[in-house]
Amino acid sequence: MNMIIFNSAFLLIFIILLYPLISSLSPKELYPNWSSSHVKTAVKTSFFISLIPLFIYLDQGLESITTNWNWINIGPFDINMSFKFDMYSIIFTPVALYVTWSILEFALWYMHSDPNMNRFFKYLLLFLISMIILVTANNMFQLFIGWEGVGIMSFLLIGWWYSRADANTAALQAVIYNRVGDIGLILSMAWLAMNLNSWEIQQLFILSKDKDLTLPLLGLVLAAAGKSAQFGLHPWLPSAMEGPTPVSALLHSSTMVVAGIFLLIRLHPLMQDNQLILTTCLCLGALTTLFTAACALTQNDIKKIVAFSTSSQLGLMMVTIGLNQPQLAFLHICTHAFFKAMLFLCSGSIIHSLNDEQDIRKMGGLHKLLPFTSSSLTVGSLALTGMPFLSGFFSKDAIIESMNTSHLNAWALILTLIATSFTAIYSLRLIFFALMEYPRFPPLSPVNENNILVINPIKRLAYGSILAGLIITSNLPPMKTQIMTMTPLLKLSALLVTIIGLLLALELASLTNTQLKTTPTLSTHHFSNMLGYFPMVIHRLVPKTNLKWAQHISTHLIDLTWSEKIGPKSTLIQQTPLIKLSTQPQQGMIKTYLTLLFLTLTLAVLIIAI
């Protein structure tokens, strides 16, 4: 009976979420209130329904794999429509629905003047459905459908304000960088189909025991690096801030950017014994978390600071995959979703109240004018730094404890600890510039947060940012044996580096506040502010070099060869000997011509006489 309720609840969730999309296909124009009455209500209802399988799982540990029907048969190769409702999908679905419900409610206020708001909500709903398909998929083909779904919806949503050149560029960047990752996923799927003759995830785990999976796993790491913005494929993530703030909140909290990490979590049994892949994930994640945290230190755009913090946390999740602790990475995904969505909604509230101003240097004093938003932003920033008893602490502290007691790679540990300290610095810098001191914005700014569409979503996410970590860790037993003993210094290392970062940030803030002259631009500051020169090299130098070589080749091949050497010059070279031969006797020498004439006449007379 419980199994029927369990599966029926998930089926009902899909039906309810699809209903607004189906109803929008009607030829009649949608009424203005459609986005609130249909989309928000559907997501809200789905969240409460998703609690039913969650409670059944917590009570009985019930999981299920449901195969609905057979899609395609190619000889012995079957592709089924199959759903896997295990711990990961059962917990992640309510989290994603809860966060999306809050974001949609906030978007009703934030996007109220947009003429295409109904279409905007439809895109957000499709984005969510694609992510749920990805999370619940039990085969690679179905997972790929969800994977491409979040990719194309991110393109449409980042480029929502398509009349802005920056938004179009950012949307193209997102889709191109993700295409690089998609190549890795497609090649991995092709290898698995050729060598294991199956895409069913459970079958892959069984069939792969005696195979060397290094090549397909490298493809999966490339796919995760593209989707989750790891170092090398990260520039699209800060650029994605060109989209509306609700898009940024949904993109960074519970949908697209965690899809790559979730792929590795879902397929982790394939890589748990492959040291090369685990080391690759560990080093890639450590490099990402440090580099992006360093870039966040000098940014002045409030949304870009939060965006780089997302990339840094994704690097931390990748480190956890490399430590062979996928359940900790999943825990961090769930806790991170709440405070990251809240940080973006608070940023959106501030931006809207300050006439679309995003520069934190032009803010200040908002703790008096926007008290609720300021309090929530502070709570979210503290949760991000891993402050004890907030949700981020339960996952972040466990990850760093796991790193401290592992014997894998000391460099990765050091980089991660430095990045943790940097997280505290840029979080406090954001609070100091945006909320404290005196106002630095025009006095006519329409500062106002007295709207339930602003207060309620942020309040719900604040509850999640405070309680989610405690609730999840209290109800879910660990999947692996936890560390039993640890020296006090190792236990407190995460907290110590966070406190060091906070103290350093306070010292830097006081120095900045009391300085009398501008600080000279240091090379390290320039490196961080220019994002490690990465966009300049990849987006300018490489295309410029390609253009230069292409131009060089085209001018030599087409202009010099065809237009000159093969065309006019070739004709000239062929005609010149004939011209010289015919013009040689005609050199203007009259005496010679007369002599030849007389000789010719004499010979002619003699011939005639004879």
Curated annotation (Swiss-Prot):
The chain crosses the membrane at residues 3-23, 90-110, 120-140, 141-161, 174-194, 213-233, 245-265, 276-296, 305-325, 328-348, 374-394, 408-428, 452-472, 492-512, 590-610. Keywords: Electron transport, Membrane, Mitochondrion, Mitochondrion inner membrane, NAD, Respiratory chain, Translocase, Transmembrane, Transmembrane helix, Transport, Ubiquinone. It catalyses: a ubiquinone + NADH + 5 H(+)(in) = a ubiquinol + NAD(+) + 4 H(+)(out). GO terms for cellular component: mitochondrial inner membrane. InterPro entries: NADH_DH_su5_C, NADHpl_OxRdtase_5_subgr, ND/Mrp_TM, NU5C-like, Proton_antipo_N. One of its GO terms (molecular function) is NADH dehydrogenase (ubiquinone) activity. It is found in: Mitochondrion inner membrane. This is NADH-ubiquinone oxidoreductase chain 5. GO terms for biological process: ATP synthesis coupled electron transport; electron transport coupled proton transport. Signal peptide: none annotated. Core subunit of the mitochondrial membrane respiratory chain NADH dehydrogenase (Complex I) that is believed to belong to the minimal assembly required for catalysis. Complex I functions in the transfer of electrons from NADH to the respiratory chain. The immediate electron acceptor for the enzyme is believed to be ubiquinone. The gene is MT-ND5.
